[in-house]
């Protein structure tokens, strides 16, 4: 495991998490799965998250190279990795996997900050949204990871905007 010191504070409201240079610009949201990794991107103003790509997880680490490439290609100023805590707010094996991936990616894309964001139930929420949109179950597999990444990133953007607005008013 790579030292966690490469990662930045994990909460969008952290004063330390709003460093100069990370105000405007695209953010990437990442949903870490055991087989596939969903990636979403925001607009430069940080208002709307949209699906970007599904990256196949490889033992060789090729997925990390692809994620780092996407950070560069999109000119991302920040990367948000979903942290799937348990409902009891504990870190299980899936969360540890996300932490490890975030640490490895942070080492590759430094000085771009890589943060963790709570993502409990985002895949369930993404599945429900796809089902309600009429996407058949067998077709969901191709886009579910991207939809979960969109949910993670959009929630983070919304929370960050709310907290930044509260600071500006206070």
Curated annotation (Swiss-Prot):
PANTHER family: POLYNUCLEOTIDYL TRANSFERASE, RIBONUCLEASE H-LIKE SUPERFAMILY PROTEIN. It holds the Pfam family RuvX. Could be a nuclease involved in processing of the 5'-end of pre-16S rRNA. It comes from Mycobacterium marinum (strain ATCC BAA-535 / M). The keyword Transmembrane does not apply. The keyword Membrane does not apply. GO terms for cellular component: cytosol. Its main location: cytoplasm. Residues 1-29 are annotated as: Disordered. SMART domains: YqgFc (SM00732). It is found in: Cytoplasm. GO terms for molecular function: nuclease activity. This is Putative pre-16S rRNA nuclease. Belongs to the YqgF nuclease family. Its EC number is 3.1.-.-. GO terms for biological process: rRNA 5'-end processing. Keywords: Cytoplasm, Hydrolase, Nuclease, Ribosome biogenesis.
């Amino acid at each position: 495991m790579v030292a966690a010191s490469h990662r930045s504070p994990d909460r969008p409201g952290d004063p330390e998490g709003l460093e100069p240079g990370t105000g405007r610009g695209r953010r990437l949201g990442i949903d870490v799965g055991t087989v596939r990794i969903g990636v979403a991107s925001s607009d430069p103003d940080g208002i709307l998250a949209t699906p970007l790509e599904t990256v196949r997880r490889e033992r060789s680490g090729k997925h990390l190279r692809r994620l780092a490439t996407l950070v560069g290609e999109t000119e991302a100023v920040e990367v948000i990795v979903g942290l799937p805590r348990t409902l009891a707010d504990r870190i299980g094996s899936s969360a540890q996997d996300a932490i490890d991936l975030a640490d490895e990616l942070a080492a590759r894309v430094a000085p771009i900050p890589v943060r963790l964001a709570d993502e409990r139930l985002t895949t369930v929420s993404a599945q429900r949204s796809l089902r309600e949109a009429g996407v058949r179950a067998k077709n969901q597999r191709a886009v579910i990871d991207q939809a979960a990444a969109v949910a993670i990133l959009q929630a983070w953007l919304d929370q960050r905007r709310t907290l930044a607005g509260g600071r500006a008013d206070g």
